[in-house]
Amino acid sequence: MAAKSSVSSWRSEMSSNPHRWMMTSPGAPMVRAEFEIGELSADQVVVAVAGCGVCHTDLGYYYDSVRTNHALPLALGHEISGRVVQAGANAAQWLGRAVIVPAVMPCGTCELCTSGHGTICRDQVMPGNDIQGGFASHVVVPARGLCPVDEARLAAAGLQLADVSVVADAVTTPYQAVLQAGVEPGDVAVVIGVGGVGGYAVQIANAFGASVVAIDVDPAKLEMMSKHGAALTLNAREISGRDLKKAIEAHAKANGLRLTRWKIFECSGTGAGQTSAYGLLTHGATLAVVGFTMDKVEVRLSNLMAFHARALGNWGCLPEYYPAALDLVLDKKIDLASFIERHPLDQIGEVFAAAHAHKLTRRAILTP
C-alpha cells in the first residue's frame, strides 16, 4: 500500500466538483459521474484537465471491445494536458504548473526502464487503460514523467493549454518513431497513412531534415500534407505495389537523394498499409510499425535478410522525450492548430460517434 502524505493544494480548493465520463460497457452511452479525489500518495498529483484528445485507441476500447486493464466502469482518455492543483509531499514542486501527462508512465526502476525500454515497462500506468483517464474534470496521476509547459511560449505560439493535450500521444508517438529510426538530414522518409499520428510523423520527419513522401488514399489529407512538410504525395488508390516504389525512386533520383536506407513509417493501422510498407523495403531500410490493426498480413520475411533491413515496433514514447517533442510545437516546427478542434466534454457521445464514422477532419480535443 502506498504511504499516505501531506497534500498541498493550489489556490486552496477545486474550481468544480470533480467528475468523469464513464464507459460502463462497450458501445453503451457514457455516464457522467462525480467522484471524490481521496487521499494522495506522496508521489501523486491531481491535474485539473484543460483538454483530452480523442484517440483511435479510445475508439477501439469503446466500439471494438478491446479490453482495458482496469475493470469497467472506466473514464477513457490518455492525451491529457492541464494544471496541477494538488500534490503529494514528494511532488509539491509541480503545484500550480501547466503540464502534459504522459500517455504511458513507466515505473522507472525495473530492468526494462533502466535499460531504456520504459515504454514496455510491465508496471507502466496508462490513463484510460490502467487508471481513470482524462475524459474528466480532474485526474489523479503519478508525478513521475510530467512534462512542464512553458505558458509564455505557449501563448507566443498562439495555442491554449488544451491544444497541447495531443502532444501526449499523437505527437510524441511519431516523435519517438522518428528518433528510433534514426532519421537525419538527406534521408528519404516515407509515411503511410497521414491522418492523426501519420500527419505529425510527416511534420516531425521534415523537421529532422528528411525529404518526406506522404502516402494515403484521401486526396484532402495528401493536399494538407503537401503544405506541411511532404515533398511528394502519392495516392495509394491511384498508384500501388511496385509503382509506389518506382515513384519514390524517381523522386529520390530527381533530388539527389539515396535509393537505399529509406525510413518507412507505417501509420495507417491497416493491413493494406502494412503490406505496402513492407513492399517499399530497400537495402538498409528501416520499417517502423506505428499504427495498430488486428488484420493479418502475409509477407516474405526473408526480404529483411536480403535487404539487410530492420523492422521496429513503436509503442508510445518515453516521458524523457516529451520536452523535445513539445519544443517542436512551441517553435512552430509542427503546426498543431490546423489539425485539432475543441469540443465540450459533455458532447463526448457525439464526438466519439463522429470520430468513429470518420466525419471529423481534425483530431478532437474534449474540454471540461
Swiss-Prot record:
Q: Where is NAD(+) annotated to bind?
A: 56-60, 173, 196-197, 216-217, 221, 290-292, 308-310, 314-316, 363
Q: Pfam families attached here?
A: ADH_N, ADH_zinc_N
E.C. number: 1.1.1.368
What are the GO MF terms of this UniProt record?
alcohol dehydrogenase (NAD+) activity; oxidoreductase activity; zinc ion binding
User: What UniProt keywords are attached to this protein's entry?
Assistant: Metal-binding, NAD, Oxidoreductase, Zinc
Q: Which GO terms describe its biological process?
A: benzoyl-CoA catabolic process
- Reactions mediated catalytically: 6-hydroxycyclohex-1-ene-1-carbonyl-CoA + NAD(+) = 6-oxocyclohex-1-ene-1-carbonyl-CoA + NADH + H(+)
Q: How is the cofactor bound?
A: Binds 2 Zn(2+) ions per subunit. One of the Zn(2+) is essential for catalytic activity while the other has a structural function.
Q: What class of enzyme is it?
A: oxidoreductase
Q: Which GO terms describe its cellular component?
A: cytoplasm
User: Which residues take part in binding Zn(2+) 1?
Assistant: C55, H78, D169
What are the binding positions for Zn(2+) 2 in this chain?
Answer: C107, C110, C113, C121
Q: How does it assemble?
A: Homodimer.
**Family membership:** Belongs to the zinc-containing alcohol dehydrogenase family.
**What does the UniProt record say this protein does?**
Involved in the central benzoyl-CoA catabolism. Catalyzes the oxidation of 6-hydroxycyclohex-1-ene-1-carbonyl-CoA to 6-oxocyclohex-1-ene-1-carbonyl-CoA. It is specific to NAD and is also able to oxidize 2-hydroxycyclohexane-1-carbonyl-CoA.
Q: Which PANTHER family match?
A: ALCOHOL DEHYDROGENASE 1-RELATED, VACUOLAR PROTEIN SORTING-ASSOCIATED PROTEIN 11
> What NCBIfam families does the record point to?
dearomat_had
Specify the protein name. Answer: 6-hydroxycyclohex-1-ene-1-carbonyl-CoA dehydrogenase
What gene name is listed for this protein?
A: had
